[in-house]
């Protein structure tokens, strides 16, 4: 009888141990690392000024309108430390000469991808730095120039990128401050000779059109400073955007500056139907 009781007790202990091991294995396997995409869609309006001596020695000034999209996500590998960002924008500008008798139009498309290493020196404060790649294409159109009315531009760059964010509360309202900076370090860009027409390029004069870009002849800084004000599932983005670029090649000098007010919406999205408390969520911005 005692032997039977001991055997039963051993079987019960073995069953309990196997059950606990199975529960732990299922729990460990069921925990997934989720990396939400922080998406921002914004409308920008502000002031712009342009100097392009290929078209005119005069500086034109006017307004700019830009539609911008931004997507940030933690990387699959080392997701606590590495984040990636993709940005795309389309812009249109209308500017007048100092005498206000000539109008200049500027159309641009920008695409960029970057990866940054981040850390949190203090609670609620995140900083990150890294690099990426950027593509810019666009054109200036000056109707009064009958011979050379268009100045095209195109560049591919390796960029240096930085991000900083700080989360706080204003009363009961959660607010996240964010600053993003991007600068090309080295790249390649297009520029014709001074006075060279695009008809000459069309006829086959392709020499000297591509140039190696660095800070001495192809400088640009793009800085976004914004506040994301939480409204529940989405946040209202209000901010300021500075975009400054300059260049000098073939005796052609270019200067372009925009100062824009930013209004948009930001939200975090996951490609799942539901959340579980055991799931590990790693956002791109803390």
Can you say where each PLM-predicted feature lies in the sequence?
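Residues on the lipid-exposed face of transmembrane beta-strands in outer-membrane beta-barrel proteins
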Residues: 67-75, 109-117, 131-135, 160-166, ...
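Extracellular loop and loop/strand-boundary signature of outer-membrane beta-barrel proteins
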Residues: 51-59, 70, 95-103, 145-151, ...
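Transmembrane beta-barrel strands of outer-membrane/channel proteins
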Residues: 39-49, 86-94, 129-139, 164, ...
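Residues that define the transmembrane beta-barrel architecture of outer-membrane proteins
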Residues: 59-67, 103-111, 125, 150-160, ...
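Outer-envelope beta-barrel architecture signal
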Residues: 33-41, 78-86, 123-131, 171-179, ...
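Predominantly the C-terminal beta-signal and adjacent terminal strand-loop region
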Residues: 180-182, 190-192, 211-214, 218-286
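Short glycine/proline- and aromatic-enriched beta-strand/turn motifs that initiate or cap beta-hairpins
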Residues: 22-83, 282, 286
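Outer-membrane beta-barrel transmembrane domain signature
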Residues: 147-233
